């Protein structure tokens, strides 16, 4: 579960290393975001000379969470870290590579470009 003030690792090659969640999109009272949900965040750590810099406000989709998530077949999925991929307004990823596994829930949310770039879908 990602909420305001949560810090997430960035799992792409945009140059950002870490973002801070400042809003969970999807309604005025929405508090938590899970795998496949879109958040608005600010870049807290970035590589020098990258496409994004510290302080930029960006949209991102959550691809890994440490909080377990129950799937329709009764199994649970959980990861070792909270991670997100930066996206454009249209939903396409800003980077050209994705690092680490991503959740299968992204397929249900129609993030096919992220699914195709990911090395592993769990």
UniProtKB/Swiss-Prot annotation:
Any idea what this protein is called?
Large ribosomal subunit protein uL14
Which Gene Ontology BP annotations are present?
translation
CC per GO annotation:
cytosolic large ribosomal subunit
Q: Which Pfam families match?
A: Ribosomal_L14
The organism of origin for this protein: Frankia alni (strain DSM 45986 / CECT 9034 / ACN14a)
Entry's InterPro entries? Ribosomal_uL14, Ribosomal_uL14_bac-type, Ribosomal_uL14_CS, Ribosomal_uL14_sf
Give one GO molecular function term: large ribosomal subunit rRNA binding
Subunit-level organization: Part of the 50S ribosomal subunit. Forms a cluster with proteins L3 and L19. In the 70S ribosome, L14 and L19 interact and together make contacts with the 16S rRNA in bridges B5 and B8.
* Assigned keywords, A-Z: Ribonucleoprotein, Ribosomal protein, RNA-binding, rRNA-binding
Source domain of life is Bacteria
Role according to the record? Binds to 23S rRNA. Forms part of two intersubunit bridges in the 70S ribosome.
Q: Which family does it belong to?
A: Belongs to the universal ribosomal protein uL14 family.
């Amino acid at each position: 579960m990602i909420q305001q003030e949560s810090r997430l690792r960035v799992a792409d090659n945009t140059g950002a290393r870490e973002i801070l969640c400042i809003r969970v999109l999807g309604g005025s009272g929405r508090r938590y975001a899970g795998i496949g949900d879109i958040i608005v965040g600010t870049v807290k750590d970035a590589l020098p000379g990258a496409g994004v810099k510290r302080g930029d406000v960006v949209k991102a989709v959550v691809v890994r969470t440490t909080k377990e998530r129950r799937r329709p077949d009764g199994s649970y999925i959980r990861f070792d870290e909270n991670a997100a991929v930066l996206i454009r307004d249209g939903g396409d990823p800003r980077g050209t590579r994705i690092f680490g596994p991503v959740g299968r829930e992204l397929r249900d949310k129609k993030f096919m470009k992220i699914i195709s770039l990911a090395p592993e879908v769990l």
